[in-house]
């Protein structure tokens, strides 16, 4: 965990996660979140777009961050993950344009 991070360091950390380790582990976000969306629909009967599935994860991270800040804290991982999910959203958008 980087204690004294500026915004660019957060974004670089998020970028390295979504284009490196996590993408290698989970596949491209379009494929990964298409599968997650399909599982969610099977469980709940609620249809989401792939973009909405990614945005749901952004909402989860923002909720955790809001709780941490309300408690006087700061949750580095939630900041990085939120930036990463926004990056995933962009990757999904561009992959669908092709």
Regions found by a protein language model. Give the residues of each.
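Intrinsically disordered, low-complexity regulatory regions
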Residues: 1-98
